[in-house]
Swiss-Prot record:
Organism, scientific name: Azotobacter vinelandii (strain DJ / ATCC BAA-1303)
GO cellular component annotations of the record: urease complex
InterPro entries documented for this protein: Urease_beta-like, Urease_betasu_sf, Urease_subunit
The protein's name in its UniProt record: Urease subunit beta
Major location category of this protein: cytoplasm
PANTHER family xref list: UREASE
Localisation per UniProt entry: Cytoplasm
Superkingdom per UniProt: Bacteria
Enzyme Commission identifier(s): 3.5.1.5
Reaction(s) this enzyme catalyzes, per UniProt: urea + 2 H2O + H(+) = hydrogencarbonate + 2 NH4(+)
Amino acid sequence: MIPGEYQIQDGEIELNAGRRTLTLNVANSGDRPIQVGSHYHFFETNDALVFDRALARGMRLNIPAGTAVRFEPGQSREVELVELAGLRRVYGFAGRVMGEL
């Protein structure tokens, strides 16, 4: 193996198999671009993003790890969210949960 080399298996890989998902319409009401990473608790994103926050509690973007979605000022788009896994405890981010979901 060469350092940094990828050895990719043939076929498809299904991300987040079996987890509940949700599609939301999200609008950037601000005057600056907002980028949200793959594992950010979507409920706690920038307040300039307008969407049903209650539905997004305990969820993150359903995109590959290490990637992000960018919302330009005035832009509205649909995003798919997936429920958080593991112990379902959320600490940090914007400090709106700080414990179990």
